[in-house]
Amino acid sequence: MRVADFSFELPDELIARYPTAERTASRLLSLDGNSGELTDLQFTDILEQVNLGDLMVFNNTRVIPARMFGQKQSGGKLEILVERMLDDKRVLAHVRCSKSPKVDSIICLDGGYEMIMVARHDALFELELQSDKTILEVLEDVGHMPLPPYIDRPDEDADKERYQTVYNQNPGAVAAPTAGLHFDDAMLAALKDKGVNTAFVTLHVGAGTFQPVRVDNILDHKMHSEWAEVPQNVVDLIAETKTRGNRVIAVGTTSVRSLESAAKASPEQLEAFSGDTDIFIYPGYQFQVVDAMVTNFHLPESTLIMLLSAFAGFDEVKNAYQHAIAQKYRFFSYGDAMFVTKKAN
């Protein structure tokens, strides 16, 4: 398939640049992958889409304030976007400036902190913090929330809360697992009251999630790598859920990719998983774990819309997106959501 097959025209006014006043105030488009049937709902109606005994799997990564500003010793301004924390002092990062910093050069950050450029790894720079503080402490002090480029505004204080799930736990993401942004504590309690079980995986979303696919044929695309973990207790809950005949519902494409990465690593029987994953899911993929998913509306020609097309059918997703645009759903990270059931293999 061609990347252009996943293109669509989106009016600029449908890009959500701010979240709704309340997390659950978004709209929800339900898509049945088998029939293609679409239903316009409110996000709170998700309670009617799930059943007693279903298992909802969330990504509990925490977004770090990964964007920092500073200057080189020469005085040239630069912007750093952390891609991955290597340890308490070292990071892999994207560096934007007029001329790339050289190995062993010093970068002066806002707040008086300094980093040394240790090495370059393709498009990424390995930087080491020169401070008694940890990199996380420095990010919390002078870092900015790494809003996606299409939001096209400076980050604000409110983004520290709203570009973060309420159940976040493990710091490391530089982009939010956005399907989870719609859930508040009251909604999680309501799911529990209905008898829906919950479980948590971790996938530290990288900045690569926003990188365009730069090839014509999707088979030529090299997926970026991210760290993921599926604990043993989640594996056990999945087995119990499947045995009962209930569904595994992944909240977000990152939860889907975590679970399917675990299945790929142990194809005979699902096992706990921890490590890097570069799984690329596109039409033709046979899902091993996930039966339904909650997801936001994705960028045209992105690997995420390819994943959704693999899950619910290419034509079905294309039709759903045309419907969403006609009905003026809000798109991307701060936008509305979908509840999607899998198309039978």
From Swiss-Prot:
Instruction: Assign the protein's first listed, main location to one coarse class.
Output: cytoplasm
Q: List the disulfide bonds.
A: none
Record field: catalytic activity: 7-aminomethyl-7-carbaguanosine(34) in tRNA + S-adenosyl-L-methionine = epoxyqueuosine(34) in tRNA + adenine + L-methionine + 2 H(+)
Family statement: Belongs to the QueA family.
EC no. given is 2.4.99.17
Q: Name one GO cellular component term.
A: cytoplasm
The domain of life for this entry's organism is: Bacteria
Where in or outside the cell is it found? Answer: Cytoplasm
**Which pathway does it serve?**
tRNA modification; tRNA-queuosine biosynthesis
Pfam families associated with the record: Queuosine_synth (PF02547)
**Function field:** Transfers and isomerizes the ribose moiety from AdoMet to the 7-aminomethyl group of 7-deazaguanine (preQ1-tRNA) to give epoxyqueuosine (oQ-tRNA).
The record's GO molecular-function terms, alphabetically, read: S-adenosylmethionine:tRNA ribosyltransferase-isomerase activity
* Entry keyword set: Cytoplasm, Queuosine biosynthesis, S-adenosyl-L-methionine, Transferase
On subunit structure and binding partners, the annotation says: Monomer.
Fetch the PANTHER family from UniProt: S-ADENOSYLMETHIONINE:TRNA RIBOSYLTRANSFERASE-ISOMERASE
Q: Which organism is it from?
A: Shewanella halifaxensis (strain HAW-EB4)
**One Gene Ontology term from the biological process aspect of the record:** queuosine biosynthetic process
Any idea what this protein is called?
S-adenosylmethionine:tRNA ribosyltransferase-isomerase
